[in-house]
Amino acid sequence: MAEPDSTTDSARRSAIEAELRRLEESALYSGQMQFEMTKQWRGINLWLGLPASGLAAISGTVALVSATGRVAAGVIALVASGFGAVLTTVNASHRMNQAAASANSYLEIQTAARQTREVDLPYLAIDEARQVLAEITTRRDEQNKTAEPPNRRAYKKARRNIGSGGQTYAVDETTTPTGR
């Protein structure tokens, strides 16, 4: 390997910075899409869970109040169990929690990439900077393996939210990055 010089160090530092920006952007979009998936799964959980619970309560009430309401109570109970069966099969609450955990993991990766780029990179030795980049990349790759792929709707909503400044910090609007 050639001896490092200031030109080579500068080029490598710029390449590491560019890659950190890519990781940050990737984590930004992936995290926002997972937050959108969290919202969708929460909605599905409520849309299936509330009717199942309400109909079960109604069928129990109808069955207890009147002997002539047994058929109606049975039909309502069957509909409630149908909602419950779909809810159990879809497992919306687990998927909601999984999407939220993935979103937060992506936020951690985004923050680590940004802090490394903005705070640490100017002061790290090139080999140390490369090692930190590799560690953040590994974290992102591991998260990509476990995160559920987002659907088209989550992708579009995430892109719209980011485009409208939904992931912008106020401090970034009033200051400029340190020399970059």
Language-model segment annotations:
Residues 2-51, 65, 86-180:
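Conserved non-transmembrane functional hotspots
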Residues 47-91:
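Short hydrophobic alpha-helical transmembrane segments
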